[in-house]
Structures are given as structure tokens and as C-alpha cells.
């Protein structure tokens, strides 16, 4: 009987551990976001004096910035929505990641095509999730 009572506490302890880990992850991601912001500011400053070879690097870093931002927003949403990750945020992050991949590595047309199909699939999934949520709300 005593083991049973301790076992019932396990989900609460694991939830607390998860919350603490996500909090520290958000702090680490915030540091990385600040680092990316500094890199972008330096890049813009260098571009004013034409010391930049390629703007693709800047675009890639900008998309990494948005990915950090989206992960932080996901963690904030997790805490605000009673410890639940909304699926649409994962879809946003997936679309951003694939767009970054296409921008950085677009040498082979067939690969770009398949990555674009992956984005289309995620957009369809996003539409289905939003439609399901709007039907459930009404």
C-alpha cells in the first residue's frame, strides 16, 4: 500500500523536473538568442562598409534567430497553457527549419523540390489542426 502511494507521486515529481529543465532550457535559448542578435547587428554594421561576401549567411543566421525565438515562445506557451505544448508551434518550427535548409543548401533542384513538398505537408497538417480546433470550439 505504501509503494502505491509513492508511485502516485511520481508523475508530479517528473512534471516538476520537466518544468525545471524547460526553465533552464529557456534561459539557455535566451542567451543564444542574444548571441544571434549580436551577430546580426555586427553583420549589418559590416554590410554598411561592404565587407560582406554573402548575404546567404546572414539569412541563415536570421532564420536561426527565429527558430530560437519560436522555441522560447513554445516554452512560454507551455507554461501558460497548463503544461501543454500546442502542436501548431511544432509545425511553425518545422516549417522555419526546412525553409532555412532550403536557403542554405539549394544546389540540387530535386532536393529543394522534396523539401518544398515537406513544407506543403506541414502546411496541410497545420490547416487540419486549425480546422479541428475551430470545429471543437464551436
UniProtKB/Swiss-Prot annotation:
It comes from the Bacteria. Keywords: Cell membrane, Membrane, Transmembrane, Transmembrane helix. One of its GO terms (biological process) is cellular response to phosphate starvation. GO terms for cellular component: plasma membrane. It is found in: Cell membrane. It is a multi-pass membrane protein. The keyword Ribosomal protein does not apply. The chain crosses the membrane at residues 14-34, 56-76, 84-104, 109-129. Belongs to the PsiE family. This is Protein PsiE homolog. It comes from Bacillus velezensis (strain DSM 23117 / BGSC 10A6 / LMG 26770 / FZB42) (Bacillus amyloliquefaciens subsp. plantarum). The lineage of its organism: Bacteria, Bacillati, Bacillota, Bacilli, Bacillales. The gene is psiE.
Amino acid at each position: 500500500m505504501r509503494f502505491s502511494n509513492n508511485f502516485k507521486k511520481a508523475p508530479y515529481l517528473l512534471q516538476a523536473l520537466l518544468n525545471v529543465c524547460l526553465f533552464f532550457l529557456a534561459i539557455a535559448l535566451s542567451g543564444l538568442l542574444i548571441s544571434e542578435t549580436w551577430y546580426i547587428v555586427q553583420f549589418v554594421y559590416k554590410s554598411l562598409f561592404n565587407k560582406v561576401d554573402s548575404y546567404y549567411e546572414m539569412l541563415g543566421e536570421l532564420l536561426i534567430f527565429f527558430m530560437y525565438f519560436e522555441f522560447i515562445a513554445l516554452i512560454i506557451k507551455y507554461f501558460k497553457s497548463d503544461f501543454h505544448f500546442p502542436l501548431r508551434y511544432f509545425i511553425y518550427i518545422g516549417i522555419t527549419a526546412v525553409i532555412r535548409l532550403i536557403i542554405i543548401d539549394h544546389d540540387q533542384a530535386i532536393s529543394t523540390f522534396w523539401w518544398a513538398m515537406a513544407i506543403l505537408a506541414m502546411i496541410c497538417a497545420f490547416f487540419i489542426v486549425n480546422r479541428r480546433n475551430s470545429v471543437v470550439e464551436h
